[in-house]
Amino acid sequence: MSDREESGSPEPRSKIEEDLESDEEVKTIKSEEVDKTQDNVEDEDDEEEEEEEEEEEEEDDDEEDVRQRKKPRRERRNQFLDVEAEVDEDEEDLEEDEDGLIGEDGFVAEPDADEPDASDDRFHREMDRRREAIAEEDAERLADEYREKYGRSTANKYRGDSGVIPQHLLLPSVNEPSIWGIRCKPGKEKELVRQCLRKKLSLQKSRNPLEIMSVFQRDTFTGYIYMEARNQQAVTVALKGLVNVYPQNMILVPIKEYVDLLRATKSAETELVPGAYVRLKRGKYGGDLAIVENLSENGLEVRLKLVPRLDYGRNAEAGIDGKRKRVARIPPPRLFSEQEASQYDPRNLQKRGPNAYVYAGDEYIGGFLYKDFKITLVNAENVAPKLEELTRFNSEETDGIDLASLAQSLRKSAAAVQFQGGDVVEVSEGEQTGVQGTVISTHGDIVTVEATTAPLVGKRIDLPSRSLRKKFAIGDHVRVISGNFLDDTGLIVGLEDDSVTLLSDLNKKEVTVFAKDLKKVSDIGGSHQVGDYELHDFVQLDALHVGCIVKVERDSLKVLDQEGTVRSVTPSSITMKLTRNMEGLATDSNGSEIKIGDTVRETVGEGRQGAVLHIYKNTLFLSSRSLGVFVAKAFKVNTIVAKGARTQSNSQATGPDLTKMNPAVYNARPGQMAPPVMPKQGGFDRLKGKHVAIGPGSQHKGCKGIVKETTDDIARVELHAPCKVVNVLKHQLRIYDDYKKTYLSYMEFATPRGMRSGGGRPGGPPGPGGPGSGGQTPSWGGGGKTPSWGAGGKTPSWGSKTPSWGGAKTSSWGSRTPAANAGGAQTPAWGAMGNKTPSWGASESRTPAWGGAKTPAWGAAGAGSKTPAFGVARTPSWKSSSAGTYGGSSSRNKGWEDLGSGNSAPTPGYAAATPGEMMGAPTPGAAHHPWEDSAPTPAAYNDARTPGVYDPRGSGPAQAETPAAWSTDDAPRYDDSPTP
């Protein structure tokens, strides 16, 4: 350029240069655009091909640089440019003049003779071949190649959503903030968390923000909230000014417990909405059904509507301090009664409006209780309300019950639905809604169903039980498998969503139940039992009526009595159930015995025929397949078929077993002695009016009451609680004894006092049970000439080898002197005149009387006898100065002169030389003084002249015992005499 400027023509050359330079810039820009296009195409190819092309291009560039060192890069660009098309036609004249200039500039690429002709389009052909090969490749193969080539390069790239972090790196460490547990008032945990959140937000942009990271509470840890902070001071500042929290004793949670404390658990809480059914967890209304009326603003309390349980203060007793004590018995649920409240507890009753009252601080509207409960006391899961519970909320009409909402709440409980194999079901929710099928099997909450409708006909699918409901059609015969109408059967007459109306086979009434409680059956059945009573049981209705149960209903029984009348009674009104051994016996018109199970036919009237179910006196309860149960008189029937292979001829020949007519013998168990019959005085039974307790063997065991009426073996007892009259066998009673302050068995009560174990021995002192025995022979309390109950007769009995009292040839009762009651003895008995031994009252005798004795006794006045008399012994005994012979004075009217002890005989007794019974009295005792209760002759009971028994009841004058064994004073006793 500098040479041209020096030649003297700068302007034309400058213009040409400018034009050439502008053209060169345009072409350079276009070539760059082409290069960019080529680069874009090459970028679309794989990286390996791109590297190969770059290597080839570098080799070509090296060759071109050698050939054209003046323009190394333009050679590559000129291959893709049409140079001739870019030159302006106006400049054709200048081309010849300026060939050298153009050649020097190198704008036009001159073809090199050494370069081959195909070098210009080599790259074009290569590109075309590659594009054709790519187009011909299979798309699936190409995708595999791309995945293989580029998958390795992209696998190492980090993606935030696909990164996997080891679990141990998520565990808390010592570098994490600490968690502090703070005690608070139970039920205020959530409220305190909200207060801390508001305080944190309000102080966030202030000069002193709270330095806590988080605040939370757990439902499983009541009474605590937890704060996350770096130090304890930050927690104290955050809690400053809050109520219902106690920051004095904070708990630092250990690091190893962070995981359990912060583990997220799925909440099982059910959202409470007005109208939902719930149950209370505990308290007086624990387990009762309630309806949600409203929720409080803080969400901690809920207002419920429920049926109240009130006794209106009748079962509460006032204590010493005037406060009422609550009893443990919970009243039954009943609607509020304003009349009862005003009658029994008017002080706590206030009227707020029409049919609205406030009683004892609670609000009652329309008879229902409206009360606020803490939400923690409410259970909204598995409520499963029953229809009988819902009828309490609408006692007037059942149309008010929302069965649809009730069924919706029941679906939430999987345990409320029971599916069995063969049930026809329908899918009620999910993608298969409306599909019907048959249940094949069940496994927990999963039910396997074989579809019977399109588009899944024949396929088996597993579905959760909560998404299924049973499907029935009108006319199906079903059975109730749960609920209040359990085991009832009937015909479906109406369908409405999940509720089914059926006509019961038992009472021909329509009942409404849920479809989940039904099962399709073909048989007809029903409940045959209510409480303890079943169909055809024989029961006692009252004192005069018995009957047979002929029909069992839901809450009542149909009973046919002995008069042929059918009564409708409740189980609680039945007195008792009669057993087979309590039934009577009867004979037919031919005199044949009738037994239970025999088949008989009426001889008069309609001539009905049936089998004997029960027998009551002369009334038969018969059962016929076509007539049911009916009543007939025994003397108006004939036996057709006898039970137990008995024949009518044998029955007529032998007649009835009269031994079974006695209930005491017929009802006795084998090996058991029949209870004794009570002795009656003037037709009055002493058992009447007694306080008794019912013992084992009766269904009323443990109950107490008063005996009102009695028969030979049955007593009618009026119970204290419950207040009713029942029939009880006498031997099952325990009679209260006012004397002993204890209960006696019927056997003890019926046994006379003298014969009881505590009555004393015959002729001895009275025991604790009653008066002693003694008196005239024979007597119920003493012995006789025949050996009595305590003696062994001629064989020596207990206590003596010498024949004992009551039948010995020697004098009885251990006395050598003939004593009273010594009948049959060779020694003359009492009253025999002319005996060798002087009789009593004899003033003169060969044998010295009591006035003298060979062995002088202490204080004796010459009393003596070969046979020691009364009061005289070989060894001087005490008071030997007394008369030796019973009544041995010169005057018969004068008794003993000694006024000492009158009930004890001074003859040696307890250790007498003559063998005798233990503590046997040798001589009939007499009184010390001539009273009316003293007589030398043994007499009967209550006879003043004969030593008898002592009656503690004071029914007559006191009688001296024979022999007397004790004294109530301090006089010497009979058993105190020394051994001779």
Curated annotation (Swiss-Prot):
Residues 797-815, 836-846 have a biased composition (Polar residues). Residues 1-120, 751-980 are annotated as: Disordered. Belongs to the SPT5 family. The SPT4-SPT5 complex mediates both activation and inhibition of transcription elongation, and plays a role in pre-mRNA processing. This complex seems to be important for the stability of the RNA polymerase II elongation machinery on the chromatin template but not for the inherent ability of this machinery to translocate down the gene. Component of the SPT4-SPT5 complex. Interacts with RNA polymerase II. GO terms for cellular component: DSIF complex. Residues 40-65, 83-102 have a biased composition (Acidic residues). It comes from Yarrowia lipolytica (strain CLIB 122 / E 150) (Yeast). InterPro entries: KOW, KOW_Spt5_1, KOW_Spt5_2, KOW_Spt5_3, KOW_Spt5_4, KOW_Spt5_5, NGN-domain, NGN_dom_sf. Pfam families: CTD, KOW1_SPT5, KOW2_Spt5, KOW4_SPT5, KOW5_SPT5, KOWx_SPT5, Spt5-NGN, Spt5_N. Residues 880-891, 905-916 have a biased composition (Low complexity). GO terms for molecular function: chromatin-protein adaptor activity; mRNA binding; transcription elongation factor activity. CDD domains: KOW_Spt5_1 (cd06081), KOW_Spt5_2 (cd06082), KOW_Spt5_3 (cd06083), KOW_Spt5_4 (cd06084), KOW_Spt5_5 (cd06085), NGN_Euk (cd09888). This is Transcription elongation factor SPT5. Residues 1-17, 25-39, 970-980 have a biased composition (Basic and acidic residues). Keywords: mRNA processing, Nucleus, Transcription. Residues 770-793 have a biased composition (Gly residues). It is found in: Nucleus.
